[in-house]
Amino acid sequence: MEALGPGPPASLFQPPRRPGLGTVGKPIRLLANHFQVQIPKIDVYHYDVDIKPEKRPRRVNREVVDTMVRHFKMQIFGDRQPGYDGKRNMYTAHPLPIGRDRIDMEVTLPGEGKDQTFKVSVQWVSVVSLQLLLEALAGHLNEVPDDSVQALDVITRHLPSMRYTPVGRSFFSPPEGYYHPLGGGREVWFGFHQSVRPAMWNMMLNIDVSATAFYRAQPIIEFMCEVLDIQNINEQTKPLTDSQRVKFTKEIRGLKVEVTHCGQMKRKYRVCNVTRRPASHQTFPLQLENGQAMECTVAQYFKQKYSLQLKHPHLPCLQVGQEQKHTYLPLEVCNIVAGQRCIKKLTDNQTSTMIKATARSAPDRQEEISRLVKSNSMVGGPDPYLKEFGIVVHNEMTELTGRVLPAPMLQYGGRNKTVATPSQGVWDMRGKQFYAGIEIKVWAVACFAPQKQCREDLLKSFTDQLRKISKDAGMPIQGQPCFCKYAQGADSVEPMFKHLKMTYVGLQLIVVILPGKTPVYAEVKRVGDTLLGMATQCVQVKNVVKTSPQTLSNLCLKMNAKLGGINNVLVPHQRPSVFQQPVIFLGADVTHPPAGDGKKPSIAAVVGSMDGHPSRYCATVRVQTSRQEITQELLYSQEVVQDLTSMARELLIQFYKSTRFKPTRIIYYRGGVSEGQMKQVAWPELIAIRKACISLEEDYRPGITYIVVQKRHHTRLFCADKMERVGKSGNVPAGTTVDSTVTHPSEFDFYLCSHAGIQGTSRPSHYQVLWDDNCFTADELQLLTYQLCHTYVRCTRSVSIPAPAYYARLVAFRARYHLVDKDHDSAEGSHVSGQSNGRDPQALAKAVQIHHDTQHTMYFA
């Protein structure tokens, strides 16, 4: 086993090679949305492009380079069609006649009003060999050369980048023939994702249909009405109220608008604020011809200068450009500029509308992707840039053989110790009792829904049914609740819970009934998890008024886990051999605040298994430096779990206390890392785990296996045989595994679709092994991973990622609620705004610190 020293920098970090292919499971014929790319054995020439003035949007840079190639055709470019990435990289199939010299050119673009001149210099960088890439794909080289993959990526994206609106790795075009409004001035645009990926023997182009939210190009007045729910602008005869103005400002700040009062000159501006005063009162210093300045209102100015009598002088103005420049525009002369993507978090309603508009059954998605690729609008078609480099993209999906892994059996308890066998990723608890059920003797009910919504008789009926189901499940709730009262508002949570803790000795659980979305939830979890250390179970009032055995049974799953029970365990004899010695499973995740929320910190969570099943887990959580303090070097460190040494150490100590064993193996599932950052994140984290071990005992060196779990990718798998499709949505069966054809040419990775798809097309999780002291075979690791997907306590189904990785996400998400500052925040919806309102790092750290009574429980279940 290798010792991890500070060792090589991340750039030299070599992940383990694939230990062979898996063989377990029933073969299944599949199609993947990867399209084979034929590349010639040629050299490609890489040039650096420097455009002044700098910091122009990529779209402008592309126009500049496009114009330059046409304009300097005779002298320099000839018939070459360079591929260009919109920043600094340009590739040609034949060298330019400039040798290694730098060449400077001037390019003029027709601008709004006046032409714009750019200075462009082009300089040779290197020769990129596609021959080397082909050798790597055939498995003859240790590493796939990044520079050739990058060159291919730029060349294949060149044409779509000119034709469509690029967003990340996807391309979108304005809606034609469909309209999916999301409300709040937003709408759905459909497009496609495209990325070049090295695979076994071939380069592949991964193509998927995608959708995202854009702002609708419309007059600002209409936008404002949508945001503020104003039915008819003519009914808005008064100025906006403060709360209306704040809401409107939040939505429009940062957006680009264009003016309509100057004829063809549609100048564009970025909004920085909304004025407090209406246009009839908002003044600015108007420069007179005699050099003096006089205060003039915006409404007056528009009347004098443009003979424009404002229709809505009582509405505010947009302040645009730089704050200090005081440029004001009345709402009625502005439109939203087309093609702006919405980066702010969607509301819950918008999200659900978006899902309804975009969810496609697997066969429909397969059909849509195939149509897209064959329609020539994208790849395969007459793309002069691909032709220039001799690149051919096949237009048929890649066929491959996967395997459907056998599902593990699950052991239940009670008198008859039943075993459940999942079918299609699902099993049920009927006639089964928990492996270890907790007896609940002292419990309380707090109802935050109003009495008229949730009458006492309904409450009583709910608690009676809950007791019946809990008894059937082997988690008997003995007797009526010791306390059952109505309450109102988040402010009453803390005093009530304190009273309960003082009054009822041995109180095990508080069941809290919530009236829909409410700040009460965040407060219940803050008080229960961090302040008093009490187990709480929230229930939506709709589930109390109309109960179903399924809902009650699901509540019992969560309650039993929170109170230290064990719902079920993997039947021991079928587990992989890694269980023959003490092993700890760690799950880790770093979650960032939604875009546009610079004030909030990132949260790192690490959980660890605490028994041999593994079923019980403990959590550790930390607040990390927030996004605005980022320089390029720090960009990766922000993705790294910064305090991992102390977190891993805590979990190892706790494992020892729980089991009296020291783990000889550590299996670490890491969620939330993007592909480009994997190696930079893995290296410091591996060292941190090693340090944690050595800090416990100088020669304590358990074998570490480090696996990145990714769900945010665009690989989709489809059944080649219609008869094998499963369920209404026609997805691949749960347990479908792929480790060849579309996977990495030499590294240890695989796709596993461990869950049964319910809505839309299943997204297989992608697993990449970045370190493996434990020398897993492909079969062992794939089976282990699949079995861990069956151990998630919240439901009786196999989930899409292993339980430890899932729990780490839950812990981080719960910490967001702990950070909600109830005096400043509306914890509205799921986008909890855990404002750090100037709270210092110590205060933030304290806010997520779990109470010692709760610390070693599964409070996050």
Swiss-Prot record:
Subunit structure: Interacts with EIF4B, IMP8, PRMT5, TNRC6A and TNRC6B. Interacts with ZFP36.
Name under which the protein is recorded: Protein argonaute-4
Family that this chain belongs to: Belongs to the argonaute family. Ago subfamily.
Primary location class: cytoplasm
Localization: Cytoplasm, P-body
Residues covered by the Piwi domain: 509-820
Region of interest: Disordered: 825-846
Function: Required for RNA-mediated gene silencing (RNAi). Binds to short RNAs such as microRNAs (miRNAs) and represses the translation of mRNAs which are complementary to them. Lacks endonuclease activity and does not appear to cleave target mRNAs.
CDD domains: PAZ_argonaute_like, Piwi_ago-like
Top-level taxon of the source organism: Eukaryota
